[in-house]
Amino acid sequence: MFINSNPFLELTRPTSNKIIYIGGLKTRKILDEAKKGAVLFSFGSLTDTTKLNERMLKSIMGAFRRFSNIHFIWKVDNVTVNNNLKMFESAPNVHNFEWFRQPAILEHPNTRAFITHCGQNSLTESARAGVPIIGIPLFGDQFYNCIVGETRGLGVQ
């Protein structure tokens, strides 16, 4: 039996060795079809995207729409999407997910850039995959990490 999930997202429960977790197939299909490239956009697991105001959302979506031949994979809360459904539906090149396997997306050959908050894990995964970053630090160590990333030639802020 195939389950479109990831064991990391499941609670402890009885299971069977006949279950195969196949979560992430949708992002793989998007990336495979992104012949002109894809950009990953994530501010990590601690950032609450429901706090983004309408002006910020419109700015982000407007920028993404201008690059219609590039696919954008955005980690964004479903509440944010549902509250702004028309805006998200108007950009067929923007693909929203509440969760995805970030290293797998970064390691895909069609991933061209990573818009990130510069959390330590994101910076490390991006460097390992060789994907340039566009850093937008929000709090904590992210400001330092972003400076280190820029200094080391991993991207810009």
Map each language-model feature to its residues.
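Catalytic core of nucleotide-sugar-dependent glycosyltransferases
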Residues: M1-Q157
